[in-house]
Amino acid sequence: MAQAVLLAGCGDLGLRVAERLLARGLEVWALRRHPPSAAPAAIRWIAADLADPASLAGLPRHIDRVAYLPAPGGRDPDRYRAVFVDGPRHLLAALGPQPRRWVFVSSSAVYGEHGGQWIDEDTPTAPQGFNGRLLLQAEQWLQANLPGAVVLRLAGLYGPGRSQLLQRLREGQARAAAGHWANRIHIDDAAAAVDHLLHLPAPLPCYLGADDTPMPLDQLYGALARLLQAPPPAPGPAPAQVGSKRMSNRRLKASGLALRWPDSLAGYRDLIERGMV
């Protein structure tokens, strides 16, 4: 019998993880409040809400691995708490101790302001916003209750269909703070990282998911504007509650993951040239 993996929350990132798991020949279950009509037929969908424990009754009992990667469905603290703090508790109660690996997809929002310095998994956390505080609370609870759980703290995702930034640049509406360092990872590399950590023997408790090229926002936006043949972005304030930092991916790469898109500008260029954004 094929090993079974549950994707708890299965949006754009989850679907890309699912494709990799299916290619391994695994049995893939995906939990979502409203399963999509267009998705790989081999995915076994579960219509449920992580914030509603009653909806999780009857989950399959033979799940071997879990990737927890939902979208919050809103930018308010109550929804974040329901999905990221309460959700793992509900899911663990529903599944029991059977899964031998959990990967919790978190965010670099758990870090505070670092003045553009390099950070890694051992850098102290000091989240500035409610999202980072609640994600950190969820990480700590999960690792206290599942000592083998693995946390993946992702940088900002970009990739096909994620065109908001490029659209703002085209329209001359983007603003960039000089000297404010930002980090990116292609969504396909993020999916590869989740798949990798689901199967990595003896993983460490935490990994940062970012590419090799953190850049100040004004330099990144300026380079993207040139690729788009758009006007350079005007100066603007730093993003609210997003500290300036450079994320080190050394631990993730040392574990054996090879990034397809280590340079975000090369990744953006490919998307623009292929008309995918």
Model-derived features: positions:
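N-terminal Rossmann-fold NAD(P) dinucleotide-binding loop
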Residues: G14-L15
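Conserved Rossmann-fold cofactor-binding substructure of NAD(P)-dependent oxidoreductases
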Residues: I43-D64
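NAD(P)-cofactor binding segment of oxidoreductase domains
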Residues: L59-V103, Q137
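Conserved Rossmann-fold NAD(P)-dependent oxidoreductase catalytic core, especially the SDR/UDP-sugar
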Residues: R89-Q128
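Catalytic helix-loop patch of NAD(P)-dependent Rossmann-fold dehydrogenases
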Residues: G115-V151
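Substrate-positioning beta->alpha
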Residues: L157, Q164-Q167, A176-L198
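Mid/C-terminal beta-alpha module of Rossmann-like enzyme folds, strongest
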Residues: A191-G243
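C-terminal amphipathic/interface module of NAD(P)-dependent oxidoreductases
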Residues: A240-V277
